């Protein structure tokens, strides 16, 4: 939401034209296209982060990158450097989509099938709270402070994810099997084509 609704509001407040703001909506397409890079997340581990486990290593790296690029957004003036601002927003969305893949896989692999409903509900609750903070909370705060501060604060909120990740063990659901890289590309493509 920080690179969609909240970012669009920031741009509107500083009188960026609506066509340009509409163009920023394309940034969130990264979430729709995440099936393209999900086989990479499924089959490769992050060097230097392996000690945390495959899924956690992806989540940790993506959170670090999101924090960095949210901070870069916060120190970039979109009225004078819109193209750089857009690039930073794209990277936040792109790394966020990769983090989504890793979090979904982590959630699915950490428990047995009969516990999946509870985990999905907990995930949705956390997601909805994050949306409220990143939209309504950010807009209320921006009306009282400034956009730079809001995005810096939101990047700090990302640190809560590290706490949750640290407290959660990375278990392996024994009923799931790992697909090879080529099989996962075929499976993802087939599933995506069937759904659409």
Report each predicted region and the residues it spans.
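Helix-loop boundary and gating motifs at the non-cytosolic
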Residues: 1-28
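Conserved small/polar residues in nucleotide/adenosyl-binding loops
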Residues: 191-196
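Central cavity-lining transmembrane alpha-helices of secondary-active solute carriers
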Residues: 23-44
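Glycine-rich segments within core transmembrane alpha-helices of 12-TM secondary carriers
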Residues: 121-135
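Symmetry-related core transmembrane helices of the 12-TM Major Facilitator Superfamily/SLC fold
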Residues: 151-166
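Flexible cytoplasmic inter-helical loops of multi-pass small-molecule transporters
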Residues: 169-187
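C-terminal ends and interior cores of transmembrane alpha-helices
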Residues: 60-78
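Transmembrane alpha-helix termini and helix-breaking/packing motifs in multi-pass membrane transporters
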Residues: 133-146
